[in-house]
Amino acid sequence: MKSVVVQYKTKSDRGDDNQRIVEKVFEELSEHDPGGLRYATLRLADGVSFAHIAVVKTADGSNPIGQISAFAEFQREIGDRCADPPAAEDATVIGSYRFFSD
């Protein structure tokens, strides 16, 4: 199992755009479950900060979100939407209450 947290800030006028694009990723995930992935995105109260949390459980450790075309679209112009670029860090789940399991 591999866990990753990605954080970034959008430009002040791009938070809503970013949210719409992220919502499309979740729509496609619901339609075409790639398996081996638990994924969440949070928008912080300031309206421009976002955090993505991914837990990958695949045999080879590859992240199946790369199979999602809406995610490719999300990544395509992320630099244009961001004031602070995305920073990804590996993470360790030390506890979870119904967050990563049904």
What positions do the PLM features span?
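An amphipathic, aromatic/His-enriched active-site/gating alpha helix that lines ligand/cofactor pockets
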Residues: K24, E28-L37, V55-E89
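Residue-level signal for secondary-structure boundary sites
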Residues: R14-D16, D60-S62, S96
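Hydrophobic/anchoring residues in structured secondary elements
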Residues: T41, D90-V93
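Short, low-order "capping/linker" segments at domain edges
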Residues: T92-D102
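Short, well-ordered beta-strand segments in beta-rich or mixed alpha/beta enzyme
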Residues: K2-K9, L37-S69
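Short, surface-exposed ligand-recognition loops at beta-strand->loop->(often short) alpha-helix junctions
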Residues: K9-R20
